[in-house]
Amino acid sequence: MPQSNLKIDYTVQLWREGRQYVAHAMPLDVMSAGNTPDEARRALDEAVGLFLKTATDMGTLDQVLEDAGYALCEDGWEGPAWVGVERHTLSVVA
């Protein structure tokens, strides 16, 4: 079976945890970390690539992408259109 290249977009959240930077690929829910923001981004790109390759090898790529909110279009898979990313604070009696 011939292989084809998959081009997919995702939004990256980046934050610091102690001395590490964490990168999170939304909406795929894949995360990685590094000592610098650039290192975390590169590690995340590698992790996303491995995640998608594994899903392809298992025959579950379509389901994984649909579950993450992607839609199959004429030009390939299109991710959700973000309308905002917000930070909220909530006080809870515990």
Predicted regions and their residues:
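Generic alpha-helical hydrophobic packing signal
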Residues: V22-H24, M31, F51
